[in-house]
Amino acid sequence: MIIPSIDIEGGRAVKRIRGQRGNYIFQGDPLELAARFRKAPLVHVVDLDGAEAGGLVNISVISKIAEILEGRCELGGGLRSLEAVERALSLCQYAVVGSLPFKNWPLFRRAAELYRDRLAVSLDYRGGEVLVGGWREKAASIAEAVRRLEEAGPYAAVIVTSVEVEGTGGGVKADIDVKSLKRIARRVFYAGGVRDCNDVERAYALGFDGVIVGYALYAGDLKKCANWY
């Protein structure tokens, strides 16, 4: 499964290089992108401002995106309360949490109990360390994170993002044990550095069930492997 992403900052769709604010390869209309990706099986939507603020910020435009996509989306970015998770699930098929398991374990566990079939966990990492709070804080090693997540799983999905190559088209960089992730989630997705269909195939060969793409949509080429593109 190839999943296009729409990252929202200040009401606009952007693609940051390595997640750095002000360092973009793309800026545009998120509603136009949603219409363009309407035939995709799933769209990954991130509230970048929300990830930094700790709560959904761009809810108005995200609501319109979800309406265009008829709910075929997964939404993350600042979901650090049960209310925020439920708000995301009222718009999209899945809610994506990254900081919550490391910032508030009891609340995360409760969310998993209530919504495990619609809850995805995002592991954004660099140098073997999971990053949270808009990629500004180190939370745990990947191995420690997986051990902790096993306690409350399984989940609908785990999303692995290689921050080092995110937004660069630098190729797949996934030095992580995919098999260990498949023990805690139905599906495991990869994001970061994907430029073209060769990178997509490499991710599949490593055992990932799907690939989230951003850079490849604006500066790469997916025409041979994405029938919605």
Curated annotation (Swiss-Prot):
Coiled-coil regions listed: none
Broad class of the protein's primary localization: cytoplasm
GO biological process: L-histidine biosynthetic process
Catalysed reactions, as listed in the record: 1-(5-phospho-beta-D-ribosyl)-5-[(5-phospho-beta-D-ribosylamino)methylideneamino]imidazole-4-carboxamide = 5-[(5-phospho-1-deoxy-D-ribulos-1-ylimino)methylamino]-1-(5-phospho-beta-D-ribosyl)imidazole-4-carboxamide
GO terms of molecular function: 1-(5-phosphoribosyl)-5-[(5-phosphoribosylamino)methylideneamino]imidazole-4-carboxamide isomerase activity
Signal peptide: none
Keywords: Amino-acid biosynthesis, Cytoplasm, Histidine biosynthesis, Isomerase
Its EC number(s): 5.3.1.16
Active site, UniProt feature: 7 (proton acceptor), 124 (proton donor)
Location in the cell: Cytoplasm
Listed InterPro entries: Aldolase_TIM (IPR013785), His_biosynth (IPR006062), Isoase_HisA-like (IPR044524), Isoase_HisA-like_bact (IPR023016), RibuloseP-bd_barrel (IPR011060)
Keyword check for Protease: no
GO cellular component entries: cytoplasm
Keyword RNA-binding among record annotations: no
Enzyme class: isomerase
This protein's pathway: Amino-acid biosynthesis; L-histidine biosynthesis; L-histidine from 5-phospho-alpha-D-ribose 1-diphosphate: step 4/9
Family recorded in the similarity comment: Belongs to the HisA/HisF family.
Name of the protein this chain belongs to: 1-(5-phosphoribosyl)-5-[(5-phosphoribosylamino)methylideneamino] imidazole-4-carboxamide isomerase
Species annotation: Pyrobaculum aerophilum (strain ATCC 51768 / DSM 7523 / JCM 9630 / CIP 104966 / NBRC 100827 / IM2)
